[in-house]
């Protein structure tokens, strides 16, 4: 009898421990992530460690997402993404309806600002390699120009990105 009682008590304690964090309060917007250390930054283009990325990835959507089955990037925040192989130029059309936390609309100007920030001579983060194949990167990164020549606004929700090489 003692063994049965001990087993049931152990099982109850184990189930309590396993299920203690399983339910969220209705309407809760809190997320809990187990990390090996405290994030150094939550600025998306300034992170260098996986622990930072784990938090940042929960904060906002991205222009592209990785297809879980094929590992090929697919548009997420983009309504369309077209590529012209002759000119090595992408045309990105941002989905309307995204807003900043203050309610202001997210426009293609914000995307262009971010890409040019990553190419800037003043940028010290590790993500500049993400834009290094865009035309005009070398000039922007050296401080010779402000912004990349391969990044052009078409309208408030559309832009072109020309690569420097394939």
What are the language-model segments listed below?
Residues 127-166:
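Surface-exposed binding/hinge segments that line
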Residues 1-9:
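Positively charged n-region of N-terminal signal peptides that target proteins for export
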Residues 34-85, 116:
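N-terminal lobe/hinge region of extracytoplasmic solute-binding protein
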Residues 9-18:
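Bacterial N-terminal signal peptides
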């Amino acid at each position: 009898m003692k063994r049965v009682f001990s087993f049931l008590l152990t099982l109850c304690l184990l189930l309590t421990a396993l299920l203690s964090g399983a339910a969220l309060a209705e309407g809760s917007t809190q997320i809990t992530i187990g990390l090996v250390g405290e994030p150094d930054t939550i600025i998306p283009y300034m992170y260098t460690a996986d622990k930072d990325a784990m938090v940042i990835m929960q904060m906002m959507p991205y222009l592209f997402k990785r297809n879980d089955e094929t590992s090929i990037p697919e548009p997420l925040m983009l309504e369309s993404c077209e590529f012209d192989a002759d000119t090595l130029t992408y045309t990105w059309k941002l989905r309307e309806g995204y807003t900043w936390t203050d309610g202001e609309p997210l426009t293609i100007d914000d995307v262009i600002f971010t890409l040019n920030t990553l190419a800037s001579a003043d940028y010290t983060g590790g993500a500049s390699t993400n834009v290094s194949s865009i035309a005009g990167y070398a000039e922007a990164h050296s401080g010779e120009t402000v912004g990349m020549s391969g990044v052009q606004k078409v309208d408030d929700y559309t832009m072109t990105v020309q690569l420097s090489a394939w």
